[in-house]
A protein has these predicted regions:
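Short coil/turn segments at alpha/beta junctions that flank glycine-rich nucleotide-binding fingerprints
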Residues: 80, 97-100
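Conserved acetyl-CoA-binding loop-helix of GNAT-fold acetyltransferases
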Residues: 79-92, 115-119
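Conserved catalytic-core motifs of GNAT/GCN5-like acyltransferases
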Residues: 31, 105, 118, 123-140
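Acetyl-CoA-dependent GNAT
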Residues: 4-76, 87-89, 93, 97, ...
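Conserved phosphate-binding and hydrolysis motifs of nucleotide-dependent enzymes
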Residues: 9, 51, 55, 81-83, ...
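C-terminal "cap" of GNAT-fold acetyltransferases
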Residues: 100, 107-111, 130-159
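Residue-level recognition of the GNAT/N-acetyltransferase active site
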Residues: 9, 74, 78, 107-109, ...
Length: 159
């Protein structure tokens, strides 16, 4: 078969939770994932191949802002364009929703993820000190703007 990107379905939750376990020191549980899925202020997409979830992204929406809450790709599937395709698709959906911008946090030490987000136009805008546990580490806050700054009329706004 081949990889396709689809909306996450309830039946995929156990696979998403397993990915969380593989990828993060403080993973979301099945219950946490399940509670977000039916919420209209969240959107989850997955890269799948033959029913197997290879990776997924979750985004939360507040007014015209997006927050990428989850990005996970199976360790054995990394460096194959899956994260790239997922971020591109979520950015496309953010634009269709007319979002002004999207933000995310990433561990300072996660150079591959930082490079991926940078490739897609996310730029560092700040640091969250001691944001992560296990191990304790700062997060880099990254943002992508989907509108021109002139359109936002924010020349007098401190970002």
């Amino acid at each position: 078969m081949g990889m396709t990107i689809i909306d996450v379905e309830e039946s995929m939750i156990p696979q998403l939770a397993a990915l969380e376990e593989q990828c993060f020191s403080m993973p979301w549980t099945e219950q946490q994932l399940r509670s977000q899925l039916p919420d209209a202020s969240h959107e989850f997409i997955a890269a799948v191949d033959g029913g197997r979830v290879l990776g997924y992204v979750g985004m939360m929406f507040v007014l015209d802002e997006g927050y990428i809450s989850n990005v996970a790709v199976s360790p054995e599937c990394r460096r194959q364009g899956i994260g790239d395709a997922l971020i591109a698709e979520m950015d496309s959906r953010a634009k269709r929703r007319a979002l002004s911008f999207a933000t995310l946090e990433v561990r300072e030490s996660n150079a591959p993820a930082i490079a991926l987000y940078s490739k897609h136009g996310y730029v560092p805008v700040g640091t969250r000190k001691n944001y992560y546990d296990l191990p304790r580490e700062n997060a880099i806050l990254m943002t992508k703007f989907f509108t021109d700054k002139e359109d936002m009329h924010c020349e007098d706004t401190i970002l």
